[in-house]
UniProtKB/Swiss-Prot annotation:
Listed transmembrane segments: none
GO cellular component: kinetochore; Ndc80 complex; nucleolus; nucleoplasm
Protein name: Kinetochore protein Spc24
Superkingdom of this protein's organism: Eukaryota
Organism annotation: Mus musculus (Mouse)
Length: 201
């Protein structure tokens, strides 16, 4: 603003000199000074305008950067929310997977226990067969030697069929267990056994 004050003072001085009708040389000198001051003023205005434009450009860049930063922040918040949702979903899936895994482990343990029980039962059966089957075979063979009965194992269910080889003739056996009592059937079969004692030669 000092330049404007200088310009006013020079103008007043110039007017006073013109009014006093001074020498032309002094007037030219003063006019030259006035022109120089005007040029300086114009240069200062140009510099101020240029600086203002630069300041406005910087402010615009800062505003644009601020808008971009806000947009990045908004996108970051959106991505963060999506990640939180995905994390919650993954946590739920992980919980379900862990529950299913625990269930499978329990089922596997039960299967192992069942397998061990089956193996134990199989060993027990093998041990029983080692003792029982030969004994049962011996009893069956002994009963066959005593009763002389040849059984028909392919007859209908509920029917008792076979052939009793007696001392003189072979007699067929045909009994219906649905109509006859077990006691009657047992007594009848034992009645076929020959009670005559014949010592071996």
């Amino acid at each position: 603003m000092a330049a404007f004050r200088d310009m006013v003072e020079v103008s007043n001085w110039l007017l006073s000199l013109l009014g006093a009708n001074r020498a032309e040389a002094q007037q030219r000198r003063l006019l030259g000074s006035y022109e120089q001051m005007m040029e300086r003023l114009l240069e200062m205005q140009d510099g101020a305008y240029r600086q203002l434009r630069e300041t406005l450009a910087v402010e615009e860049e800062v505003a644009q950067s601020l808008l971009e930063l806000k947009e990045c922040t908004r996108q970051g918040d959106t991505e963060l929310q999506q990640l939180e949702v995905e994390l919650q979903r993954t946590s739920k899936e992980d919980t379900c997977v862990q529950a299913r895994l625990r269930q499978l482990i329990t089922e596997l343990q039960e299967l192992r226990e069942m397998e061990e029980e089956l193996q134990r039962q199989e060993r027990d059966v093998d041990e029983d067969n080692t003792v029982t089957i030969p004994s049962a075979v011996y009893v069956a063979h002994l009963y066959h030697q005593i009763s002389k009965i040849q059984w028909d194992y392919e007859c209908e269910p509920g029917m008792i069929k076979g052939i009793h080889h007696g001392p003189t003739v072979a007699q067929p056996i045909h009994l219906d267990s649905a109509q006859l009592s077990p006691k009657f059937i047992s007594d009848y079969l034992w009645s076929l056994v020959d009670t005559t004692w014949e010592p071996e030669p």
